[in-house]
Amino acid sequence: MLIAFQTIIHTLGNKMDWFKTQILNDKPVVFDPLRRQWVSLTPEEQVRQKMLHYLVGTRKVAAGLIAVEYSIKVNNLLKRADIVIFNNLGEPQMIVECKAETVPITEKVLDQAIRYYSGLKVKYLTLTNGKSMFCYKVEEGKIEALTEFPL
């Protein structure tokens, strides 16, 4: 069920030069403009920041409609979706699951996003490791792979 499409991933790129980074307590950190705080620059965070840059800079999603590390209750457990995008009415529209570039996007990653969907009904699921992106439309319990980014 995983169908990759090469989309605007070139804007995700390999460089972090458009991001504000520094060393804090001997560890690299990046300033997240959406959360308005410095966060540890892990490989997954690097992909998350690139995806946020793509969403706001290229896709023109309003920053105020994006939540980062959004808490979702799944089977009485509190989980965190990497990115949730809302519509203008405040309704969740998409869950984006980010993985480090070295982590392949597999059915296991899709299963994780589906679990998050069970706690937060959205129209779309997106999976990315910064090199590949997979998008799905979820409707009436059916998941359809898309060939382009839906927003």
Question: What kind of feature is each model-predicted range?
Answer:
Residues 2-124, 130-151:
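A short, conserved, highly charged catalytic patch centered on acidic carboxylates
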